Amino acid sequence: MKIKNRVNMNLDLHFVHRIQQQAKTRTNMTALRYKEHGLWRDISWKNFQEQLNQLSRALLAHNIDVQDKIAIFAHNMERWTIVDIATLQIRAITVPIYATNTAQQAEFILNHADVKILFVGDQEQYDQTLEIAHHCPKLQKIVAMKSTIQLQQDPLSCTWESFIKTGSNAQQDELTQRLNQKQLSDLFTIIYTSGTTGEPKGVMLDYANLAHQLETHDLSLNVTDQDISLSFLPFSHIFERAWAAYILHRGAILCYLEDTNQVRSALTEIRPTLMCAVPRFYEKIYAAVLDKVQKAPKLRQIMFHWAISVGQKYFDLRANNKAIPFLLKKQFALADKLVLSKLRQLLGGRIKMMPCGGAKLEPAIGLFFHAIGINIKLGYGMTETTATVSCWHDFQFNPNSIGTLMPKAEVKIGENNEILVRGGMVMKGYYKKPEETAQAFTEDGFLKTGDAGEFDEQGNLFITDRIKELMKTSNGKYIAPQYIESKIGKDKFIEQIAIIADAKKYVSALIVPCFDSLEEYAKQLNIKYHDRLELLKNSDILKMFEHRINAVQKELAHFEQVKKFTLLSQAFSIKLGEITPTLKLRRKVILERYRKQIEAMYHSQEA
């Protein structure tokens, strides 16, 4: 079986080569920007390369061989990238571990990948690692990436500074040799996908995969060395990791946000031109804007909707290279001054493009952002495809789709309408799992995505649902839970939602409210309560949720509509295994943990 078509390209697009080239030509220009003690600090390309070489030499001093594994267990920070690329410079492999992973999840990855050195980002990750280190026989060293981490008297533990000092000029010849021997067929990473069932699988990606994506993104995107990109999604996920690689490949500035709660302030401070985000980010902004508009005087509401309408017409014409009538130009100038520019300021005022992935984006939300002049590029991809397979074109897209194919991506619709992918971006396979690797591909080498979908005549790709997640009610009706969850879950009062329907008489839902919004609402209605549990039992609160859910699900078929729901006082948790690090629901765990609440929704009076 032929797994994939390898890309024919030379070493010019090898990622490590691209970093070296940028460091040579952009010497004193800014490569990285990060926040320390409340101040943004810059690292020049020259200093960046020096730090990379220092760490590479230290890794060589610890006898790290070609294709050995180095793991990073940390939130985003500039040292994440430094560890990553220093590892790649010596032809070793980076294994990311989500900062939110439990000690047991980290232990599995460390042992399965035979990790030799682990870099930890903060005290919590260090403490978790100490819990399991004695169960990890291949682990030789735990390096604390911050000076604030308090180390125990443990032979494996060391500070960043002491580790760096172990490298010297004695390792320089070997570093030069490793750099000169780099191959596109080398693995650059093994990323463990946190499946909703079963143990994680290590996706093997090589430099040819990454080079393919660098090349196709060059053909598709307008990113220059003048751009500034703010990174706040985790580097342990292929979406932000591949994007960061592309930013460095283009010579743009990569900014780091370790505390995701500070994203709003970082947007106004950094004023980036580029930023990746997931649909939930846009949903929250959209809901907040609409909420503010609904509370505004009638005249302002009219002005807002008029401005959005004008923006929609203006950008539609511009996207299709059509002449913009004189009157519309004047209307747009006024709408932009009064409304649209102020909305763009919520994102810093300079955003020119925002890649979006990880889930489906509601069409109305995508259209809203495009109407105000924010170029959202919703994309589709997975770890196994080194991220992007398809994406929206600039201001020209079908809002219900996941875009058109990236250059050189080959996609067809297979059995059960499954989306099948082939091309240079597709993984080598799953680490130490030959059977699972074989099962992941068709006989002619297409990757099975597990997503059901279809194309329209214009080449737009649509996802209809996850094949394995279709639920069948006891009445024989098929339910697509993610579709219903995305419809209802966009409400400003809902933080998380899990649809229940498999083998049930009707659809029900477990809902975690957005307590910030809910408590503000309760305050407005003068609802008194001692704790959240009491608040969630309040009849006015229950009626409000029922009303809002019914309003949203009118467009759903009758058998798809939620008939009963239960409000939960605690969010679904990564620690408890209810959601994955990428925030996907682990339905089996949720069904078991909330069995009583679910049974109550079906054992009470008929819906």
Curated annotation (Swiss-Prot):
UniProt enzyme class: ligase
Family that this chain belongs to: Belongs to the ATP-dependent AMP-binding enzyme family.
Single GO molecular function: ATP binding
Protein name, as recorded: Putative long-chain-fatty-acid--CoA ligase
Residues in the signal sequence: none
Gene3D superfamilies: N-terminal domain of ligase-like
Domain of life: Bacteria
InterPro entries reported in the protein's UniProt record: AMP-binding_CS, AMP-dep_synth/lig_dom, ANL_N_sf
EC number of the protein: 6.2.1.3
Disulfide partners: none
Pfam families noted in UniProt: AMP-binding (PF00501), AMP-binding_C_3 (PF23562)
UniProt entry keywords in alphabetical sequence: ATP-binding, Fatty acid metabolism, Ligase, Lipid metabolism, Nucleotide-binding
Catalytic activity annotation: a long-chain fatty acid + ATP + CoA = a long-chain fatty acyl-CoA + AMP + diphosphate
Keyword Lipid metabolism: yes
